[in-house]
A protein has these predicted regions:
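Hydrophobic positions on the alpha1 helix immediately C-terminal to the Walker A/P-loop
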Residues: 56-59
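Hydrophobic anchor at the beta1->P-loop junction of P-loop NTPases
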Residues: 45-47
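ATP-dependent carboxylate-amine ligase catalytic core
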Residues: 18, 24, 31-32, 37-40, ...
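Charged, amphipathic alpha-helical linker segments immediately N-terminal to NTP-binding catalytic cores
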Residues: 1-20
């Protein structure tokens, strides 16, 4: 079981805006400066809607895993620990990885919201996993302008 990582999340909340901004320009610019890691992710399934997204994502995850498929997931919000948002194959992301990817993203010197930062952390971490993994990505707000709507051909 994960131990709470409130300290790191509280620090992120202070450092990054939590306001909603329905614009994909910033996150796309950051990803471009990082050589478009989102393009390395295959089998992306965007889960959208107003209710039940996490239930659908969890059901799909268990179905795929029961069929010996590798699965990465990105969800929000987390219930207990920020690492719960990031499932990579068979484990949650580590705090060390979160810090590592945060530093990489900060080197772009572009200002992001907290959700944009977390989305970029997911993309960078998932891009390092098996290329045949399924990537189940829960949308945050509105699909068309949502930070998770970055792939040209999601499943």
């Amino acid at each position: 079981m994960l131990q709470p990582s409130k300290k790191i999340y509280q620090k992120l909340q202070k450092q990054y805006s939590r306001r909603i901004n329905l614009d994909l320009k910033r996150i796309k610019k950051v990803l471009e400066k990082l050589n478009n890691p989102e393009e390395q992710l295959e089998n992306v399934i965007n889960i959208i809607g107003s209710d039940g997204k996490n239930s659908v994502l969890t059901s799909l995850k268990y179905f795929l895993e029961a069929n010996n498929q590798k699965v990465n997931t990105f969800t929000s919000p987390h219930l207990y620990d920020v690492r719960q948002r990031f499932w990579l194959g068979n484990r949650f992301i580590s705090l060390k990885e979160i810090k590592k990817y945060k530093k990489i993203i900060e080197r772009t010197r572009l200002k992001l919201t907290l959700f944009e930062l977390l989305t970029c952390i997911y993309i960078l971490s998932a891009a390092k996993t098996d290329s045949e993994s399924y990537n189940l990505v829960e949308s945050g707000l509105l699909f068309k302008k949502d930070r998770t709507n970055l792939w040209t051909n999601p499943l």
